[in-house]
Amino acid sequence: SKFVEVHGAKIEYMEWGNPKNQSVIMLHGTNAHAHWFKFIGAMLSDKYHFVVMSFSGMGGSDWRSFYTRDTFVDDVWGVVNDAGMENPIIVGHSFGGMVSLITASKHSQDMSGLLLVDFVVYKPEEHHEWYADRTPARPPRIVDNKEDLIKRFRLMPPQACVNQYLVDYIADHSTRQTETGWAWTFDPAAYDGLVIGSDHSEILSNLQCPVGFYYGEHTVEFNA
């Protein structure tokens, strides 16, 4: 992993391929991290300058005392600049879709495209704040050994996966050792007070780069 400091926090990222090729950066979902997409890097490295990253408060990146949607945007653009990515295509999955859309609202003139994966842009009247009903986060759960924590790892929402080896790999890289045991890599307080905003449809209509939407064929979150 490489790291770049953004507003006092070290942000983790990984990159593959020739920086002279089209740049693509992939943004993960809630409580995820760069390793969710690491296995794709080698597949795309011959044609693209491919980058994955972990938002602050997740993966190998530092935690912060408070987070806003602009916090994550700054994380992304800090990585883009540090990796020397020119006119990148940004691919955002779920929560990463929200972050990528807000990133595009500020930087679409410097982007080659935006791909939103399993993310819906709602009209203002249909907007729902994801974290409005969230109770303040409790301290991270600590367990004695890594294996017990990995056994608790689940996909959300629950679903079958034909590539269990990928789930096992992700679970293994979703833990961190503390002074008293093992815990997940994400900051439980990352979403306390986080406002995603009701301006997504307005942002979408004003973007200056091509936009694509992708939904998993077997997703349980969305209907065709």
What label would you give each PLM region?
Residues 4-14, 39, 51-91:
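Active-site loop/oxyanion-hole signature of alpha/beta-hydrolase fold enzymes
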Residues 101-105, 112-146:
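Flexible "cap/lid" loop of the alpha/beta hydrolase fold
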